[in-house]
Amino acid sequence: MKTTHTSLPFAGHTLHFVEFDPANFCEQDLLWLPHYAQLQHAGRKRKTEHLAGRIAAVYALREYGYKCVPAIGELRQPVWPAEVYGSISHCGATALAVVSRQPIGVDIEEIFSAQTATELTDNIITPAEHERLADCGLAFSLALTLAFSAKESAFKASEIQTDAGFLDYQIISWNKQQVIIHRENEMFAVHWQIKEKIVITLCQHD
């Protein structure tokens, strides 16, 4: 599968992007993965995204001196070396990965259409959050995409993985660089940026 790697400094970390072309994917490409047998029953889309995500993760791990491919955990999560944390996300034909010494989460999303935003609003934010988003100065579809992505990154960065849903992660404040999110006894500062029609969020949880 043809891939292109780029990197971008963001919020004190380096994001590693892998653009990939699903059209020229073949099953033999998966043999690069030590755990390729675990993907034999996956669909083509899942296989291409997984492969690109692991390629991005390998680039991210090289920063810290590791030469390994994250395995698949019991909950289908990436398994990182014991001394580091990492996160992977996908959007369209782009995979993104980041590695850190602290718990970290990253997410990449295409900006919702107005119709999608309307359909998903009640599943992502509470009425109180809706008011905060209305005052943030962004178009609502963009603001909701950002809220969704920020909550995804906060969830990934949380050391306590629970069955908490989007509405359990409450946006309490917002500025041009960060979204502050509260869940039970935890606070999350989520950095964000817009890149063309894409929203990228990153949360490092100290």
UniProtKB/Swiss-Prot annotation:
Record SUPFAM superfamilies: 4'-phosphopantetheinyl transferase
Predominant location category: membrane
Catalytic activity reported: apo-[aryl-carrier protein] + CoA = holo-[aryl-carrier protein] + adenosine 3',5'-bisphosphate + H(+); apo-[peptidyl-carrier protein] + CoA = holo-[peptidyl-carrier protein] + adenosine 3',5'-bisphosphate + H(+)
EC class (word): transferase
Cellular localisation: Membrane
Listed Pfam families: 4PPT_N, ACPS
Keywords carried by this UniProt record: Enterobactin biosynthesis, Magnesium, Membrane, Metal-binding, Transferase
Biological pathway: Siderophore biosynthesis; enterobactin biosynthesis
GO cellular component: a single term: enterobactin synthetase complex
Biological process terms in GO annotation: enterobactin biosynthetic process
Superkingdom of origin organism: Bacteria
Keyword hit for Cell membrane: no
InterPro entries membership: 4-PPantetheinyl_Trfase_dom, 4-PPantetheinyl_Trfase_dom_sf, 4PPT_N, Enbac_synth_compD-like
This enzyme's EC code(s): 2.7.8.-
Binding site for Mg(2+): 107, 109, 152
GO MF entries: holo-[acyl-carrier-protein] synthase activity; magnesium ion binding
Keyword ATP-binding recorded: no
Its job: Involved in the biosynthesis of the siderophore enterobactin (enterochelin), which is a macrocyclic trimeric lactone of N-(2,3-dihydroxybenzoyl)-serine. The serine trilactone serves as a scaffolding for the three catechol functionalities that provide hexadentate coordination for the tightly ligated iron(2+) atoms.
Family from the record: Belongs to the P-Pant transferase superfamily. EntD family.
Oligomer and partners: EntB, EntD, EntE, and EntF form a multienzyme complex called enterobactin synthase.
Protein name: Enterobactin synthase component D
Organism field: Escherichia coli O157:H7
